[in-house]
């Protein structure tokens, strides 16, 4: 069986950060995700998907994402239920995020958004490793940028 969700969208409001009685951080937010098709009027509609993220990633989401920030969410669908104050059973369907990626640079129009990604995965490596590679700042920052000259490539070298 598989339960996997990957979403890219914009936050509809600032994330809500709370702490459990045990002190565990939990953030909730709603992601507006455009549908791939248009309705009868030719307009693109959106789905509003509730998301929840736990622990340190929850604090990062609350600190760096704001209303309008673009984010990528990788997680699973969860359905839970509880009894409200009136004694009625309420069902909630949400995405439990295992990873939230901040998809806009810090200096973008959305205040507080960041391009740093936080992956909440056990197999995420390179956390404490140092690299011996040093960037040469005297070189151009984009080595693939075109200077307006045609690129000389032999078609036999292309993989397609």
Swiss-Prot record:
GO cellular component: nucleoid
Listed GO biological process terms: DNA recombination; DNA repair; DNA replication
Record bears the keyword DNA damage: yes
Motif Important for interaction with partner proteins positions after renumbering to this chain: 155-160
Presence of keyword DNA damage: yes
Keyword vocabulary terms for this entry: DNA damage, DNA recombination, DNA repair, DNA replication, DNA-binding
GO molecular function: enzyme activator activity; single-stranded DNA binding
InterPro entries linked to this entry: NA-bd_OB-fold (IPR012340), Primosome_PriB/ssb (IPR000424), ssDNA-bd (IPR011344)
Any Pfam family hit: SSB
Polar residues bias locations: 130-144
PROSITE patterns associated with the record: SSB (PS50935)
UniProt domain SSB: residue ranges: 2-104
HAMAP family cross-referenced by the UniProt entry: SSB
Subunit description: Homotetramer.
Protein name: Single-stranded DNA-binding protein 2
Gene name linked to the record: ssb2
């Amino acid at each position: 069986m598989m339960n996997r969700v990957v979403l890219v969208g914009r936050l509809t409001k600032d994330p809500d950060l709370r702490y459990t009685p045990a002190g565990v951080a939990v953030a909730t937010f709603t992601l507006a995700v455009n549908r791939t098709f248009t309705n009868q009027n030719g307009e693109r509609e959106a789905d509003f998907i509730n998301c929840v993220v736990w622990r340190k990633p929850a604090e990062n989401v609350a600190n760096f994402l704001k209303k309008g920030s673009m984010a990528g969410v990788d997680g699973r669908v969860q359905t839970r239920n509880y009894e409200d104050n009136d004694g009625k059973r309420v069902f909630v369907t949400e995405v439990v995020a295992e990873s939230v990626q901040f998809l806009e640079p810090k200096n973008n129009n959305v205040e507080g958004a960041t391009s740093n990604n936080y992956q909440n995965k056990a197999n995420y490596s390179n956390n404490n490793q140092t690299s011996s590679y040093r960037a040469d700042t005297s070189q151009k920052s984009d080595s693939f940028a075109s200077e307006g000259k045609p690129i000389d490539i032999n078609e036999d070298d292309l993989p397609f």
